[in-house]
Amino acid sequence: MFDTSAGVFKAVLFSTEAPQAVQNFTTLAQQGFYNGLTVTRVEKDFVVEAGQSADGRGTTIWNGNRFSAETTDKLHHYSGALCAAADASGDCASVFYVMETLPGSSSVTQELIDQMNAAGWRADVVSAYQTAGGAPYLDYTDTVFGQVYEGMDVVDAIAQTAVDENQKPTEAITIHLSLIHI
């Protein structure tokens, strides 16, 4: 559960498809790493990002080793996807983001749909992007390790917040994470 100063949202984690990302995220959450951190980047109709520690680098890993992005054709960057950000080398650490790209936004254009179809993307994936929105160009680059199932309106509200020239919210939005096992 993500208890933010803007409200609460909940996500399910995909430990089978993204075991390293889930282990890193849950261990850091259990250690209290994310508690009190702030949302560090907001791009309206794209992402809400957090997980950078006080050093501003977002390089904390529970066991000291960065991990490679975990990609699969089973998980995609649909709106509400909880993702581990990969750096230029393809490695991930503590930074995570939630996709906020909504259906009908400019990210999933008819031209992109046509390109996906021409490239042989599965019809169900293309249809899901049309229905849910998202960022298909991030598939196979960053790790999807969860999906928001409740409180997407909170994520959408955070995505509407005023930001500075670095896309950081002008008013701090703090995070407190609680892990609920079901």
Where in the sequence are the language-model features?
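Cyclophilin-like peptidyl-prolyl cis-trans isomerases
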Residues: M1-I180
